[in-house]
Amino acid sequence: MEQAFQAAIEIGIPIVNCGPGGKSEDEATWPKVIDSLGNLAHMAEKYGVTLCVKAHVGASIYNTPTTLRAMKEITSPAFGIDMDPSHIHRAGENPVEAISAVIARVKHVHIRDCKGRGPSPGEPYMQANGRGDIDLVGYIGALHEGGYDGPLDLEIIGTKGKGTSFEQCCVIAAESRGHMQACLQACGAR
């Protein structure tokens, strides 16, 4: 990760995201995960970048309570949260309520929709903003009301090996961007 921080600072990237590691509900490995993320956050601080981690289905940090716990235990100002509503939704939570609870440390946001609460976000075309079950207008509105002005990163996964062409990926991206722009306008952020 040190090389990633060095490269980030050299090319002007202020935020480096990583996964939390560990497994959900595994208290035995929680201290190791927190120590590792804490050490990485201190290293990021040394380089003048922010390390962000997101709640991820199946990982040690996977929902709002575990995100809040990590926020409490990792005190470095270089530690931030990358929020992805699809993981919070699949953890059985309301992403609008979740973002409001952790907004103080949110430094990066992935935006992806999903249908259902399965372990997967679903087929790529169902991840396009507005096609799934997530209240993205409410989510982006909560970000705006909370004062968030950082990056919103559109994300679609699972296209490899499923026959999704480059052109289809571009259509999904364009649809998602258009929906996100409409959400930003609806909540007064644009």
Can you say where each PLM-predicted feature lies in the sequence?
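Active-site acidic/histidine proton-transfer and metal-coordination neighborhood
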Residues: 1-81, 90-92, 168, 190
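Histidine-acidic metal/acid-base catalytic patches
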Residues: 12, 64-79, 83, 89-190
